[in-house]
């Protein structure tokens, strides 16, 4: 189990034990633990740091990034950062994982923040806004290369496949499309 995931300083991906393991927010980490290993922190919006880590280890499985950092103070990356980061991930055969919980579903003028740079994530994390804020819904979407690794019965959740949540999410997405909100 030598696989590692690159994450960015100032990130916010939630408050579970694994996630706070690589958080810089000491309030989130205080009084919790033990922490999960396997994460490498780099500066946000720093392509040189990303390539340095990618080129120095064959154990990197993914790069997890918020297209726009929210909790850190709403940091918008330099133009081209996301597309160049995605290209580096492809070069080193590493998954590009976009956490769009705070930015997704038309919050930035496009359906997804990564759409501003025509980036397609290998794994896309969505939440909150996918239902228009009226029902708790989240989703993890991935390409075939990722999803075909998971066999039926290997992954699940207590509330996965909730038909009410799915109907609400579909209705919210239809409104966004019909009203051209993204």
List each model region and its residues.
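Conserved N-terminal phosphate-binding loop of PLP-dependent enzymes in the Aspartate aminotransferase
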Residues: 1-182
């Amino acid at each position: 189990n030598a696989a590692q995931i690159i994450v960015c300083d100032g990130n916010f991906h939630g408050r579970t034990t694994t996630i706070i393991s690589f958080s810089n927010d000491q309030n989130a980490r205080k009084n919790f633990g033990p922490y999960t290993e396997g994460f490498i922190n780099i500066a946000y919006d720093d392509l040189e740091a990303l390539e340095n880590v990618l080129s120095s280890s064959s154990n990197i499985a993914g790069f997890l990034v918020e297209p726009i950092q929210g909790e850190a103070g709403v940091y918008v990356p330099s133009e081209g950062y996301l597309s160049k980061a995605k290209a580096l991930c492809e070069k080193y055969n590493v998954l590009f994982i976009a956490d769009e919980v705070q930015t997704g579903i038309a919050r930035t003028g496009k359906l997804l923040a990564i759409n501003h740079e025509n980036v397609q994530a290998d794994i896309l994390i969505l939440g909150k806004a996918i239902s228009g804020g009226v029902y708790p819904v989240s989703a993890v979407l991935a390409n075939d290369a990722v999803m075909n690794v998971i066999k039926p019965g290997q992954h699940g959740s207590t509330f996965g496949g909730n038909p009410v949540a799915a109907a609400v999410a579909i209705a919210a997405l239809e409104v966004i499309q019909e009203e051209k909100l993204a």
